[in-house]
Amino acid sequence: RKSRNDVAVIGNEVYIGAGAKIIGPVKIGDKVTVGANSVVTHDIVSNSVVAGIPAKYLEVNE
């Protein structure tokens, strides 16, 4: 049986590009852009842009 700890938590105003995959119980902050075909395997801080396999930070806005 799955618990709520086994799912991804996605913040507000998040854009997830086509084909992107979110793997595991990660937390994605608010106002994040995930590039197309990216694979997210770790938590992403708010106000950032990530892309790649695995997803890496391209930009972090304060």
Locations of the language-model features?
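Conserved catalytic-core motifs of eukaryotic protein kinase domains, centered on the activation segment
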Residues: 1-2, 26, 61
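Left-handed beta-helix
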Residues: 6, 11-12, 17-24, 29-30, ...
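Surface-exposed loop/turn and secondary-structure junction residues enriched for glycine/proline
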Residues: 47, 60-61
